[in-house]
Swiss-Prot record:
This is Histidine ammonia-lyase. Contains an active site 4-methylidene-imidazol-5-one (MIO), which is formed autocatalytically by cyclization and dehydration of residues Ala-Ser-Gly. Its main location: cytoplasm. PANTHER family: HISTIDINE AMMONIA-LYASE. SUPFAM superfamilies: L-aspartase-like. Pathway: Amino-acid degradation; L-histidine degradation into L-glutamate; N-formimidoyl-L-glutamate from L-histidine: step 1/3. Its EC number is 4.3.1.3. InterPro entries: Aromatic_Lyase, Fumarase/histidase_N, HutH, L-Aspartase-like, Phe/His_NH3-lyase_AS. It comes from Legionella pneumophila (strain Corby). One of its GO terms (cellular component) is cytoplasm. One of its GO terms (biological process) is L-histidine catabolic process to glutamate and formate. It is found in: Cytoplasm. The gene is hutH.
Length: 505
């Protein structure tokens, strides 16, 4: 595998983004981008040479847009916008998210609509390639006029200001620039604004959440299948004929996943002709629930792939026509709505899993010992593990409230409608932590349920999952310290050990 990738500006796919980040590939900008970048920069220079007044080049910003700035102050203007806008707060964004922000910003500026120099783009590439990640506080953006505050923090080190993180250590920007083979840059006209305008932070946060959510989706299909077998559930509701006549492709696909996972289960065959007619909805309706989740995730993926390549700067430079146009591509409404949809999906993944845990521990529904432990009363078993799952599911319901319906005017009402895209995307990561906790508890509960069916075994596919769980967590024959077991399984989930692809290998 090549250790670098050639970035063709505007042509990132979700697959290529995953590959770049997972394999830690370095970036080389395609040479066919050079002339577009130069032409765009020359268009900006021409505005200055001809003493025209154009927003963002020789004016103030936001509600100060009517203030004209003299030519001898333009470099100071660009430095000032970075310094004044770097006022974020909160925990620092993790390195993998900052790497993705850098990648998206490089992709954005390299398409030749921002008027910046190639030298500036190469500096961002050097930071990316040397894994020198600007320290970016997580809070401060409202997702309109772009992610101004966090992108200002991204830009600070280019000026020799602020701090960066390298190999997990926070160091000064000056040290970081040396590691990347750089010296502090003096920004030219429009460059500060081009760095700050854009939706790369909200897009990166949403993409990062989407990639992890895909793993959680697969884990939920697996844990839900295990719960069906542990609770002596039926595989009839997964019959393809049922789903074909409804017609939703995602539901059809989800049902196929359940059929494939449950095929060959000795437990299922042992009660195929029992008197139980129908299972509770949390078992029976899984293809309908998870099909809807998959449908939402596919929509979110399509939206974010477009946004990963989108130009969200302002003003925009159209070098071929010599025009510089002001618009509103920096408004993150579509990202906010996509993040809200993903939040609904995550809430449903966790919420339905919590219901299955509740079913498994209830002897009246599952037919298993109360709270999945022998000598219940002396032992509490999974009683309080379910309470933890319920707590996380309830948190997710509150966190799933749509952020895109919220708006607070800023910049003296010049920016009077904002998207809240960044907070919409940021909250997804808290939901991911909650959902992975719930799924870890379901996996533990379902595997414990299988113990009571021995010597009968689950399907060959699901037995691989059972063995993986048992490799780090033994059977619960009596009460013990529970929290470490949950964390062990959460780690396996987030390390993608419970994926459908893994089962096919």
């Amino acid at each position: 595998m090549s250790e670098h990738f050639i970035l063709q500006p505007g042509q990132l796919s979700l697959l290529s983004i995953k590959q770049i980040l997972d394999e830690e590939l370095s970036c080389v900008l395609a040479e066919n981008a050079f002339e577009l970048i130069r032409a765009s920069h020359q268009t900006v220079k021409k505005v200055i040479d001809e003493k025209k007044t154009v927003y963002g080049i020789n004016t103030g910003f936001g509600s100060l847009a009517n203030q004209t700035i003299s030519s001898d102050c333009l470099k100071e203007l660009q430095r000032n916008i970075v310094l004044s806008h770097a006022c974020g707060t909160g925990k620092l964004l993790p390195d993998d998210v900052v790497a993705l922000i850098l990648l998206l910003k490089i992709n954005n500026l390299s398409q030749g609509y921002s008027g910046v120099r190639l030298e500036l783009i190469n500096a961002l590439i050097a930071l990316f390639n040397h894994k020198v990640y600007p320290c970016i506080p997580s809070k401060g953006s409202v997702g309109a006029s772009g992610d101004l505050v966090p992108l200002a923090h991204l830009s600070l080190p280019l000026l020799g200001e602020g701090e960066v993180r390298h190999q997990g250590q926070v160091i000064s920007a000056e040290e970081g620039l040396k590691l990347a083979g750089l010296k502090p840059l003096e920004l030219e006209a429009k460059e500060g604004l081009a760095l700050l305008n854009g939706l790369q932070v909200s897009t990166a946060l949403a993409l990062s959440a989407l990639f992890i959510s895909e793993t959680l989706f697969e884990t939920a299909i697996i844990s839900g299948s295990l719960s069906v077998d542990a609770a002596s559930g039926s595989d009839v509701p997964f019959d393809d004929r049922i789903h074909q006549i409804r017609g939703h492709q995602a539901q059809i696909s989800a049902a196929r996943m359940y059929r494939n996972l449950l095929a060959g289960s000795q437990i299922r065959e042992s009660h195929r002709y029992c008197n139980r007619v129908q299972d509770p909805y949390s078992l029976r309706c899984q293809p309908q629930i998870m099909g809807a989740v998959l449908h939402q995730m596919e929509f979110v993926g399509q939206t974010l792939q477009v946004e990963a390549n989108a130009i969200s700067d302002n003003p925009l430079v159209f070098a071929e026509q010599g025009d510089i146009l002001s618009g509103g591509n920096f408004h993150g409404e579509i990202i906010a709505m996509a993040a809200d949809n993903l939040a609904l999906a995550l809430s449903e993944i966790g919420g339905s899993a919590e219901r299955r845990i509740a079913l498994l521990i209830d002897k009246n529904f599952s037919g298993l010992p109360a709270f999945l432990v022998r000598e219940s009363g002396l032992n509490s078993g999974f009683m309080i593990a379910h309470v933890t799952a319920a707590s996380c599911a309830s948190d997710n319901k509150a966190l799933a409230h749509p952020h895109s319906v919220d708006s607070l005017p800023t910049s003296a009402n010049q920016e009077d409608h904002v998207s809240m895209a960044t907070s919409a995307a940021r909250r997804l990561h808290e939901m991911i932590d909650n959902t992975s906790t719930i799924l870890a508890i379901e996996l533990l509960a379902a595997c414990q349920g299988l113990e009571f069916h021995k010597p009968l075994k689950t399907s060959p596919q699901l037995d691989k999952i059972y063995q993986s769980v048992r490799s780090v967590v033994k059977e619960y024959d009596k009460d013990r310290y529970f929290a470490p077991d949950i964390e062990k399984i959460k780690k396996k989930i987030l390390d993608k050990e419970f994926s459908l692809l893994t089962l096919t290998n």
